[in-house]
């Protein structure tokens, strides 16, 4: 049985562009109503999970508040069937003034062309002692 591809590199690039524009409305157009988002930090082994479109929107809004100048660069994207991966370098300044630069990736799952799961990972950057 051939799996129908519902993800594309072009879609992942468009999502990245919306993130870099900090355009929450445009970002959310890519997400299904029953989507989920796993952020890299949080109280559980998977970070912090947001379930449903409204909760995902709030989680992303919080990200933009905590990293108001966040930018994703050096991106590479690929897809297989309904899954996609985006690798990137995230830069930004935390609300407390601390500058952040980390490599990370997003694992994406799509259904009917919409994101149903975004799972984000960041490298842990440790300053030398």
Where are these regions (language model features)?
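A solvent-exposed, acidic/Ser-Thr-rich amphipathic alpha-helical stretch
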Residues: 26-81
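Residue-level detector of alpha-helix boundaries and kinks
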Residues: 12, 41-45, 93
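A beta-strand edge to alpha-helix "cap/lid" segment located at domain peripheries
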Residues: 2-7, 57, 61-129
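Short, low-complexity N-terminal intrinsically disordered segments enriched in polar/charged residues
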Residues: 1-33, 129
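Short glycine/serine/threonine-biased micro-segments
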Residues: 20, 50, 90
């Amino acid at each position: 049985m051939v799996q129908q591809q519902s993800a594309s590199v072009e879609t992942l690039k468009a999502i990245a562009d919306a993130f870099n524009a900090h355009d929450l409305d445009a970002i959310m157009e890519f997400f299904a109503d029953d989507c989920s988002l796993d952020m890299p930090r949080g109280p559980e082994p998977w970070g912090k999970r947001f379930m449903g479109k409204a909760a995902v929107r709030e989680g992303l809004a919080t990200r933009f508040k905590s990293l108001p100048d966040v930018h994703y660069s050096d991106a590479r994207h690929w897809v297989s069937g309904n899954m996609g991966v985006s690798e990137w370098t995230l830069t930004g300044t935390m609300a407390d003034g601390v500058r952040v630069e980390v490599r990370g990736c997003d694992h994406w799952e799509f259904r009917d062309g919409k994101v149903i799961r975004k799972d984000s990972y960041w490298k842990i950057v440790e300053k030398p002692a």
